[in-house]
Swiss-Prot record:
GO terms for molecular function: adenylosuccinate synthase activity; GTP binding; magnesium ion binding. Mg(2+) binds at residues 12, 39. Its cofactor is Mg(2+). It catalyses: IMP + L-aspartate + GTP = N(6)-(1,2-dicarboxyethyl)-AMP + GDP + phosphate + 2 H(+). This is Adenylosuccinate synthetase. NCBIfam families: PRK01117.1, purA. Gene3D superfamilies: Adenylosuccinate Synthetase, subunit A, domain 1, Adenylosuccinate Synthetase, subunit A, domain 2, Adenylosuccinate Synthetase, subunit A, domain 3. Pathway: Purine metabolism; AMP biosynthesis via de novo pathway; AMP from IMP: step 1/2. The active site is at residues 12, 40.
Length: 411
């Protein structure tokens, strides 16, 4: 059976810590979408690890880690991550169906961002997915055969010829790209496998599989705050599509949310706090992007968005992250509805324009940092947790009270 870990906000919820905390109980940990525009931050034995493509199970020697077919892969960045770990043989596998991000994709991304101003990381994620949908992309499996790779490269050079100047590719682009593959392909080849068959067989044999998403539900290309979204499907449903596991294989869906809200880049954010309180949350929560180092926009927990995300994903349990960031705040707000042009909205709309948050205020608490038992939390903190559970309709089974792996309350 497989369990899914999915972010139910705008990403950066703390999925890495949760996966790292529970990965030891699984045979496989699988990253099922996105690219190196997302980052997993894990603190292990006092050392901070920032992972962008590698599944969070790499810190456990007995865990097999898979990058599945819906992930788009920068082979340069993946090679750099691989070099930071030892003994990855037979522990890391990359789907032969996953698509390769080319340097061209990053150039195109930067060019388009000038006019669209979506707030992308300009890592080439979107353009790579564009080529995938246009059926013109290069897949990891193509790297296993030099003849096929050469054919794919020639087709790529022909297709981009009209855009070389616009995307500032340079006169030596063809030569440079061939050198690029020559440098990184030998390092990547040993890890490329038919991971779809591997996972189907593992599931049939009763292996325990953990499916790890990137970004968050509200950034989903179809169901998120379009056009300010990522280029992939971020909900739990995409875990099946990417891995080849059928929906019957899914057991638990663990939704990850912070005790407050954050967002990186542009786009609507009804519960954003533009006062010094937002700055306080950012500073105390160390809310800066793992990948870009950009400061995250911060605000109060949005239960309208949270209920929507839980319904989309079929969450069976929740993990509440960074409760300790709210320590010492006298009055804590929670968005319980929106108001738009005199109308109260309790369902998440497709367009958040003109939506104003309706808040309910709770008394704060002094300290929760480092607490590992529910009974040791102050009454006001427990009341806050119970309110979230009641409103969302999903039990909170895990509460994080610091970045350290051990500072976790299990319920």
């Amino acid at each position: 059976m497989a369990d899914v870990v999915v972010g139910i906000q705008w990403g950066d919820e703390g999925k890495g810590k949760i996966v790292d905390r529970i990965a030891k109980d699984y045979d496989f940990v699988v990253r099922y979408q996105g690219g190196h525009n997302a980052g997993h931050t894990i603190v292990h034995k006092g050392v901070k690890h920032s992972l962008h493509l590698m599944p969070s199970g790499v810190l456990y020697p007995k865990c097999k880690n898979i990058i599945s077919s819906a992930v788009v892969v920068s082979i340069k960045d993946l090679c750099e991550e691989i070099s930071a770990f030892e003994d990855l043989e037979n522990r890391l596998f990359i789907s032969d169906r996953a698509h390769v991000i080319l340097p061209y994709h990053a150039k195109k991304d930067a060019f388009k961002e000038k006019s669209q101003n979506i707030g992308t990381t300009k890592k080439g994620i979107g353009p790579c997915y564009e080529d995938k949908m246009a059926r013109s992309g290069i897949r990891m499996g193509d790297l296993l055969d030099d003849t096929i790779l050469e054919e794919k490269l020639n087709a790529h050079f022909k297709a981009i010829e009209p855009f070389k100047e616009a995307y500032d590719l340079g006169e030596d682009y063809e030569k440079d790209l061939r050198e690029y593959f020559k440098q990184y392909t030998p390092k990547i080849r040993p890890f490329i496998k038919d991971t779809t068959s591997m996972l189907i067989e593992a599931n049939q044999k009763g292996a325990k599989i953990l499916l790890e998403g990137a970004q968050g539900t509200l950034l989903d290309i179809d169901l998120g705050t379009y056009p300010f979204v990522t280029s992939s499907n971020t909900t739990s449903a995409s875990a099946c599509v990417s891995t080849g596991l059928n929906p019957k294989a899914i057991n638990e869906v663990i939704g990850i949310t912070k005790a407050y809200s954050t967002r990186v880049g542009n786009g609507p954010f009804p519960s954003e706090d533009a006062t010094p309180m937002g700055d306080h949350l950012r500073t105390k929560g160390a809310e800066f992007g793992t990948t870009t180092k950009r400061p995250r926009r911060c605000g109060w927990l949005d239960l309208v968005a949270l209920k929507y995300a839980c319904a989309l994903n079929g969450c069976t349990q929740l993990a509440l992250m960074k409760l300790d960031v709210l320590d010492g705040i006298d009055a804590i707000k929670v968005c319980v509805a929106y108001e738009r042009k005199g109308e109260r909205l309790e369902a998440f709309p497709s367009d958040l324009k003109d939506c104003v948050p309706v808040y309910q205020t709770f008394k704060g608490w002094e300290k929760s940092v480092g607490v590992r038992k529910l009974d040791d939390l102050e009454p006001n903190a427990r009341e806050y947790i119970r309110f979230i559970e009641k409103e969302v309709g999903v039990k909170i089974r895990l509460i994080s009270t610091s970045p350290e792996r051990e500072d976790t309350i299990f319920l």
